[in-house]
């Protein structure tokens, strides 16, 4: 695949959408498809049942716990998770279920840093923190967040170094103005 040719020695985990697989068989098929085009592993928001099927098929899987944006309407909205004892235990159990299912890593999103420190000490999974502070094994941010690519509200865990959204809005206004001038010229 072209991406592998461009970066032959780079570890790549491809993200597979939550709703892309409706069965364990589809989860395995999607994992193999990602690997056939260059993935070393896949990142997913799947249930432990789907993670287990893919892991048993030899596909390295990174699960997702804490705030899962795609599931946020089911879990109380886009907000920090794990601030109460019940939520902290829920996050821990989610991570342990992914571990038992055979995942090698978990993306843990928007939980208290101290909770992630404690969980990281109690799991064999590689913990990847986004909005969980330095409590994980890895800390990352999305370029679209640090560059302000989308309209507010912005994630609180990410500083916006640029406002690309504003620039895109200005470009669109210029585009519309340019077409209006063109239309006036050809009338």
Describe the residue ranges of each PLM region.
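Alpha/beta enzyme core
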Residues: 1-187
């Amino acid at each position: 695949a072209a991406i592998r040719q461009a970066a032959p020695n780079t570890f790549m985990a491809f993200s597979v959408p939550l709703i892309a697989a409706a069965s364990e068989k589809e989860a395995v098929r999607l994992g193999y498809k990602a690997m056939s085009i260059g993935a070393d592993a896949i990142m997913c928001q799947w249930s432990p049942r789907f993670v287990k099927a893919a892991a048993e098929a030899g596909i390295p899987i990174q699960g997702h716990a804490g705030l899962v944006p795609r599931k946020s309407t089911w879990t109380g909205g886009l907000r920090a998770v794990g601030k109460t004892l019940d939520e902290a235990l829920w996050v821990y159990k989610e991570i342990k279920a992914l571990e038992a299912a055979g995942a090698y890593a978990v993306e843990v999103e928007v939980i208290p840093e101290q909770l992630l420190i404690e969980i990281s000490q109690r799991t064999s999974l590689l913990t990847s923190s986004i909005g969980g502070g330095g409590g994980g094994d890895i800390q990352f941010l999305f370029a679209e967040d640090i560059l302000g690519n989308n309209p507010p509200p912005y994630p609180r865990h990410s500083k916006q170094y640029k406002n690309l959204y504003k620039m895109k809005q200005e470009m669109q206004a210029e585009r519309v103005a340019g077409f209006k001038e063109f239309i006036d010229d050809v009338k």
